[in-house]
Amino acid sequence: MISTAQKIMLIVDSKTASALNQACGCARYAYNWARDTWFAKKKAGQKEVTCAELRKEFNEQKTDWMYESSKGSMDQAIKNFVLAKKRHYENPELFGFPKRKKYKSKRSFYIENDKARIVDTTHIKLPLIKLPVRLAEPVRPECLSGKINNFVVSKGSNDRWYISISYTYDDTTSLYGTDENGLVGIDMGVKTLMQLSTGECVANEHINKRHYKRLSRYQRMMSRRTYNSTHYKDIKKTFDKKNSYIKNFRKDLIHKATTEIVKHNMVVAIEDLNVKGMMSNHKLASAISDCGFGMIRRFLEYKSAKYGTLLLKVGRFFQSSKKCSGCGHVKEKLSLSEREYICEECGLVIDRDTNAAINVLAEALFIELNKRFDTDVARRKFTPADLVALATSLSGRSETTEVDAHCLLTRDGRAVMVDDFFNRLWNQVANATINCI
């Protein structure tokens, strides 16, 4: 069983938008009421109140206007405060005490799974709204066949409404062909967003840089207006829409690239980059934030779990760029302006990012072989390039699973192929007698 969610934009009219705004207001009121009530009881020296007690007290003093919104959204808002308070006391350094929600805070409310209904692939029936609301894109087939957990309606910074459908489904469907089981190492960078060990790359569109002048202009215009005036709000609305476009453009690019990588490879290796530390370099901070390294890692993690791909991480201090993939020699210095890696030991000339991606994949394979078979013999026998070449020749169709070349495998089928691949790779490594270094 896999738990996931789908976020879809709602196409609403002014009447529906007003009803959604009212539901958000009720949820915000319930959250603030729970916070104020908890503070009042604590100040009076009363015992700690539970979530159930807060809900019961809130329901006893409901007024007429509250019944115009779903009861579950207000109950969940109270529960959200209790959970936020619990997180604060468990880890006060990371989570501050929950603040009151203001009108300008992010607007959202929760809907229980039995209070809303998916009418068809492009319409959904929400509580207290007479007609079904149209969706901007169709609901996924696995969402229709799976079990709905809950719904969350929210308003984005671009003034558009979205619904997130959380659901669980049984992963028994075929996902990919047996010929799509390669190996790839990924080197993330500023000039090229993702350089693959196969020689392919994902270009960095530099979306922030392209719109920097326009965003700066909007910020200057806002600074010259009276705060919260009509003109200020109009400019801020345009500024938020442009920021939303940039965010969605970057997310769409990374979604498409990571899906293709995970679908076509059974082993993916990446560097565990310290993004926060990299951002401390003020000369590169803007360019690094434009890349979305953290988003790439998050997307690869959950998509690897979905498709049965093995995601391997290499330590952040591994010198992937300075190391020669041909002989293993490590350079003392390598400036950012050097786009080609030239090895003084073996004479290898290769693109520096491709060289780094090969080293990332080889190091990940070295670590995984050591973890599975408790020996580091592969590192003594093979150079990074030789191990990657051997592993690539062994990847593909499993010898132990009885499926023909045109049969489609499920997520569990690929996991079997990954285990079989490492067993075959270890047999080749153990039988190798020639030291390649």
Residue ranges and their predicted role:
Residues 3, 287, 291-437:
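Positively charged, low-complexity nucleic-acid-binding target-recognition regions
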Residues 1, 161-184, 341-342:
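A short acidic-Thr-Gly-centered motif at the start of a beta-strand
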Residues 51-157:
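Acidic carboxylate diad motif detector
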